[in-house]
Amino acid sequence: MPPYISAFQAAYIGIEVLIALVSVPGNVLVIWAVKVNQALRDATFCFIVSLAVADVAVGALVIPLAILINIGPQTYFHTCLMVACPVLILTQSSILALLAIAVDRYLRVKIPLRYKTVVTQRRAAVAIAGCWILSLVVGLTPMFGWNNLSEVEQAWIANGSVGEPVIKCEFEKVISMEYMVYFNFFVWVLPPLLLMVLIYLEVFYLIRKQLNKKVSASSGDPQKYYGKELKIAKSLALILFLFALSWLPLHILNCITLFCPTCQKPSILIYIAIFLTHGNSAMNPIVYAFRIHKFRVTFLKIWNDHFRCQPKPPIEEDIPEEKADD
């Protein structure tokens, strides 16, 4: 017999489905844009594709699993654990992709003349692969023992049951809060976020320093270059800000759960925090469309060619510098 779904759960499911319906097509469009436009093939956009892949997976995999967990089916402990781990993997992948983007932008303004020889497509691919491998290690750590199995087994045996525990599948029931706070948040979320803030502050400082230099007749190109870098850096810093704004509330709630077990957390706050984390996967394509000219032009080209059946001339691969990003 299927589980009873309350009106509140139905509303929750409806919002989650809406987020998924925005996230998946939006991020597929980002990947599509990079594929069809040669001007979007540098290292930064490769890292953006990695971020978009993680966001597609959030909409196509994590949100359906979150809905399943919310309904609360009875499952074996390790089955529930496998359902809970993908969100950890994808979150870590997003963080590392954002860090790679920040480092890439720093190198573009710190060593502009040597950038293309230092940051090659091959090295970018290796960095992306490394990010995903590390994300798998961090996200799958609960599968290798850092979980709540011992506590669940004690309660299972105390009730006179045998075999692997069967539980109502809930995230906090299988994932250890010590893992979430001490390992996930304090090691793999908070330090990278703080490092990215420092990197972007340095990027803005270096760009402002260059832009404040006296402009001579021969310095037009550097001024244009750093002006473009400033616009892109602002857009990518906005992506970082939205990510932090979306994920920090849930991690703060996890800290409250660990350090103040008797403290009551209103359900509405928990749901808002969950919506923010999932909704973040739908935000990035919107930011790209409104803030990065190359993406906006390519999105419109794809829309006109494939959905309105009104082909336009091929995308210009070398967009003029003054219009590259507005």
Curated annotation (Swiss-Prot):
UniProt KW keywords: Cell membrane, Disulfide bond, G-protein coupled receptor, Glycoprotein, Lipoprotein, Membrane, Palmitate, Receptor, Transducer, Transmembrane, Transmembrane helix
Keyword Methyltransferase: no
Residues exposed to the Extracellular side: 1-10, 70-80, 147-176, 260-267
Entry-linked Pfam families: 7tm_1
Keyword Zinc among UniProt keywords: no
GO CC, any one term: plasma membrane
Transmembrane segments annotated in the record for this chain: 11-33, 47-69, 81-102, 124-146, 177-201, 236-259, 268-292
Cytoplasmic side: 34-46, 103-123, 202-235, 293-326
Broad class of where this protein is predominantly found: membrane
Compartment annotation: Cell membrane
Top-level division of the source organism's lineage: Eukaryota
A molecular-function term among this protein's GO annotations: G protein-coupled receptor binding
Disulfide bonds: 80-169
Positions of glycan attachment: 148, 159
Stated name of the protein: Adenosine receptor A1
Lipid anchor positions (S-palmitoyl cysteine): 309
Function: Receptor for adenosine. The activity of this receptor is mediated by G proteins which inhibit adenylyl cyclase.
Membrane topology: Multi-pass membrane protein
BP-aspect Gene Ontology terms: adenylate cyclase-inhibiting G protein-coupled receptor signaling pathway; cognition; detection of temperature stimulus involved in sensory perception of pain; excitatory postsynaptic potential; fatty acid homeostasis; G protein-coupled purinergic nucleotide receptor signaling pathway; inhibition of non-skeletal tissue mineralization; leukocyte migration
Family: Belongs to the G-protein coupled receptor 1 family.
